[in-house]
């Protein structure tokens, strides 16, 4: 037996290693050499070839396969003992080597057994193509996540594509062929003989467990997952990975692989989070807390605190913490759809779902516990997770891991305490609100007999609501009773299943109570009923509002404050669950984080063949825009944002989404590898002036700076695809309406224009109103050099010499056209379009810029109307007090327009006495600058 330094720690701890070296003295020299290198996939492939023999056939006979795999497993296990305990191998090497071993073992055993069966029965064939059909072997759990421990079971699910039969002389159905294959394959891996075993195998994660067939068709799996799939199965399928196993020449399982992934992803990761699932996940957490194995261990006299997998603060609790966020958020955040635990934890940290410090502590705990788990298993090659109770053995374990006994115990206790506390708070950490030591939300009792409630049940709830309405809404009782009757009589409600109806019956009284406590009870009640009727067919949202009273109260406050907000929520109920964690809605939008996470999520939207899933990407961008806008809306309604700050934020969000759109669309139109887009997206109008509202269109112009011969065609195509990407109505709605009419020559012009052509047009052919529009234009997204060049061109155009009298006539004429296009025949004051309104301020500002930018270059900057008026006043172009008063008036008019929009008013009009002072100030500004014109003329030489 060797006692060389690389072996010292391993020999001191592992009785299994000592016995193997005693029995095979020549093994020491081989092991010393093997331990000098990481146990990589290439190393395992070389060992496999060596153990198979130089003349081995491509497919080994079953008995030869059995022996080779057991010897390969011993090589891997012994090498890892020495490298791991000697501090040479990190966790990634250990679990990676065991996973590669499992992939080799399963693939090799499959080929050997399949060849033996095919020799008798022929090949199973695909019905559609006649090609040989492979069995799909799915690795579950740690095998799927590529994180096997050194003495792990492997969980497998066996699947196949088409039903049919084999093509040999003794034909059997494909179903029977794969069942026999599975039955014969398992002993090759798991049977213990003189050489040991390769892996214990477990097939119980297949549909119906031990009661189900050994191999399932994909169609049968689909029916099972849709009809019977449970929450713990979502948890199980999260890590599921198709293993690299191919037995038949000329087979092509790619289509079946794509079909499998198209089943797995929506089953595990749901876009619309199901709050039934939330209750099931809570139950799963309790099952982990009170696992029957812990109780069994306690009954056997073993202290369950010594179990580092199942005990408090153990490995399974870390897995639950990480996977809970994946299950809750992964449907909307594809970047979280990772099989490996540490990969997923890193993605959650990057997404801001787990604080940096917590993520680091969880990772440190996981690495410590996994390394300890492996050390326990190295000792006697046993699948154990129990720490030794004997102090001497415990000290030996600490030494094997490189710790003094006291330091080991302290580190272990610190890690487990942190994991245990985090596990108890797992749902709060995942953004689902509740402190997890508090009781779960009360669940609505189910109808005991399971029958659909009869008309009497409808009558009962209507009577109960009538009494509540008469008490809490006496002045509007008649109207609200009529709305209640239409709601309960609607087809959506009458066709509800029992569980949803019971939720509705619990929700409606709670909704009335919440509405009664708002500033506008009747409005809130009617809008809540509209929302409830819209979401009635989605039991998840009924559950959310019925079981989270704080969330219902928040919804009531929002819809009471703004009918526009009520309509927005009704159109996008996906946003409701963001109200659970109210605090996060009031955090400032971190646009850098939004951009990083959006890019990561879009990158993860892939079809099974690796190509981008464009439909998912488009929907995801719409969902992100809705979520960010809703966050701003919540802050807006609570008075946390000024109108200017809100517009800045909405404009920054649009810029971000435009930039991401270029990145996603460019590869779809460009055919030159490595070429970058030299496109600048120029924002005009509200986006250009950073005055965007919640539902504003985007006025855009596409400019390019590229000398390639196909540039005009390429960038026109890019512009078309971008416009489609932004404005197409998908299942998640439309991102933005896009207006391209401000480009040179308008609708008659090219969709994308070179910067040279744009400059020439602006100098020689543009109308004065186009120069007015240019005062509010800015580079918004795309190539920064092209954007900078546009800004230089814009500045040059704005400082061109102009005939002031002619310009004044053009501006006045254009203002008259605007008025004619927005006639107001009412007695009300139109805040935007009437004389003394916002348009007057904007026209005056544009006129001042075009007249005076040449002599006052500060006016070239696109700073917004209020700032530009102030600068004009400071420069003496208009009286400074008037400039400040007009800026204040414009701010007030914008605020009034915004409040009216939130109230759902299409046209921002107010009684003539309202805003009279502001209107008078704007009229004075207009008269001073454009009617008298004296100041402007005096300043222009």
From Swiss-Prot:
Q: TM spans, by residue?
A: none
Cofactor(s) the protein requires to work: Mg(2+)
Spell out the SUPFAM superfamilies in the cross-references. Answer: Nucleotidyltransferase, Nucleotidyltransferase substrate binding subunit/domain
Kindly give the Gene3D superfamilies that the UniProt entry links to this protein.
Answer: 1.20.120.1510, Beta Polymerase, domain 2, Nucleotidyltransferases domain 2
Catalytic activity of the protein:
[glutamine synthetase]-O(4)-(5'-adenylyl)-L-tyrosine + phosphate = [glutamine synthetase]-L-tyrosine + ADP; [glutamine synthetase]-L-tyrosine + ATP = [glutamine synthetase]-O(4)-(5'-adenylyl)-L-tyrosine + diphosphate
Assigned EC number: 2.7.7.89, 2.7.7.42
What UniProt keywords apply to this chain's record, in alphabetical order? Answer: ATP-binding, Magnesium, Multifunctional enzyme, Nucleotide-binding, Nucleotidyltransferase, Transferase
| Cited PANTHER family | BIFUNCTIONAL GLUTAMINE SYNTHETASE ADENYLYLTRANSFERASE_ADENYLYL-REMOVING ENZYME, GLUTAMINE SYNTHETASE ADENYLYLTRANSFERASE
Question: What is the protein name for this chain?
Answer: Bifunctional glutamine synthetase adenylyltransferase/adenylyl-removing enzyme
Q: Which gene encodes it?
A: glnE
